[in-house]
Amino acid sequence: MDIPILIKNTVNPDLELWIGAFERINNAGLKQLGAIHRGFSSYDKKIYRNLPQWHIPIELRRRIPELPIFCDPSHIGGKRELVAPLCQQAMDLGFDGLIVESHCNPDCAWSDAAQQVTPDVLDYILNLLVIRKETQTTENMGQLRNQINDSD
């Protein structure tokens, strides 16, 4: 049986452990894998519920480039007012999609009420997103760096 499997990041910022989960599931014969980045637990909850530590999913992309990576801005932010800017940041960083918590009446939700948005707000957020097209490949960037070095 080959069904889609989405694997959330580990609670602690441990890329090797996260990659190990993909390897184990893949070795069991399940090949339709994707990642969900929900941020990482921290004692410091001043801004985010879970620290984004964007470098970890970026490194995951570098190590497993064919793996779709989705961002969960609801769990990273922990507050509905952070969902929109985190959605845009995830898109700017090249994530493949978003998983956003939505509820018709978020304040009455049984769990995670503070981080949920209404379907109308979600529609508004999604319509505001700027999806940037890749304009440079890694090869092009290398060529540009060489040109800069040559001119220095």
Annotate each predicted stretch with a short phrase.
Residues 1-105:
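Catalytic alpha/beta core domains of metabolic enzymes, predominantly
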Residues 86-87, 119, 151-152:
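Short, electropositive alpha-helical surface patch
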Residues 21, 83, 110-114, 145-149:
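Short amphipathic alpha-helical patches
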Residues 104-138:
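C-terminal helical cap(s) of enzyme catalytic domains, especially alpha/beta-barrels
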Residues 135-151:
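Divalent-metal-activated hydrolytic enzyme cores
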Residues 98, 113, 127, 143-144:
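Generic signature of intrinsically disordered, low-complexity segments enriched in small/polar residues
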